[in-house]
């Protein structure tokens, strides 16, 4: 299907899932600032490299999953499904972007490049190809892709992998299951039609709600532990936001419906984003 360059760029922008990429970039930026070393060129390298690699990984994912996306209402209008971008083209372009992002990270240092590549490989090979179609724990292991973004950011200014970086990565790792299981509970029928064994698809709603609450509860210690590096204001806000997150988790356990799951899902992104922004701001003040 012949399309203009501008239209094709728009299609690829949609395939790259910009709402996820900005959160991954925010994770990388908070990791860079968490180190306490402001190195503009290094931060620029990890943001550019990470953006390319993340976009490439998302595009590969949607190239691979075109058949599943066709039967899910939530994904049925994606450019790959509509035929604007072919499966082969999406995969090739995605690989090129992932490779480019890894090379840009290498301009900073090898560890940054390694974590950028690690995030992409975990998302594409471990999550998309291996676990997502086979295991209800797919998103648990897939959460390492988000952790890798934070680790890449920290490595960009330190060339190291130490306790602050590990804590930030574990925060994102533990945040991921509760966030995406809530989404899967809301769109349970969609995932079921596509044959994707998300936890809420194969387990009862009340059990899924308890697992979402457990994931969120296990996330909170890592959020609070970052107070040691981000300061008192961060600690206070993290405590308040964590209490609100658990409020939504309790509501979901009491009433495990798609509507309550959606409320939990909608709060969890701002929860993480605010914490990441606070880490950045506390290092600037």
UniProtKB/Swiss-Prot annotation:
State whether keyword Transmembrane helix applies: yes
Transmembrane spans = 19-39, 40-60, 90-110, 111-131, 135-155, 165-185, 220-240, 265-285
- Alphabetical UniProt keywords: Cell membrane, Heme biosynthesis, Membrane, Transferase, Transmembrane, Transmembrane helix
Reactions that this protein is recorded to catalyse: heme b + (2E,6E)-farnesyl diphosphate + H2O = Fe(II)-heme o + diphosphate
GO terms under biological process: heme O biosynthetic process
Q: Does the keyword Manganese apply?
A: no
Instruction: Please give the Gene3D superfamilies that the UniProt record associates with this protein.
Output: UbiA prenyltransferase (1.10.357.140)
Pathway-wise, it operates in: Porphyrin-containing compound metabolism; heme O biosynthesis; heme O from protoheme: step 1/1
Task: Return one GO MF term.
Answer: protoheme IX farnesyltransferase activity
Identify the GO cellular component terms for this protein.
Answer: plasma membrane
Q: Which InterPro entries match?
A: Protohaem_IX_farnesylTrfase (IPR006369), UbiA_prenyltransferase (IPR000537), UbiA_sf (IPR044878)
| Protein's cellular compartments | Cell membrane
Q: How does it sit in the membrane?
A: Multi-pass membrane protein
UniProt xrefs under CDD domains: PT_UbiA_Cox10 (cd13957)
Under Enzyme Commission nomenclature, its number is 2.5.1.141
Major localization class = membrane
Described function: Converts heme B (protoheme IX) to heme O by substitution of the vinyl group on carbon 2 of heme B porphyrin ring with a hydroxyethyl farnesyl side group.
Q: Which family does it belong to?
A: Belongs to the UbiA prenyltransferase family. Protoheme IX farnesyltransferase subfamily.
The UniProt record's further free-text remark is:
Carbon 2 of the heme B porphyrin ring is defined according to the Fischer nomenclature.
> What is this protein's name?
Protoheme IX farnesyltransferase
Protein species of origin = Metallosphaera sedula (strain ATCC 51363 / DSM 5348 / JCM 9185 / NBRC 15509 / TH2)
Higher taxonomy: Archaea, Thermoproteota, Thermoprotei, Sulfolobales, Sulfolobaceae
The record's gene field reads: ctaB
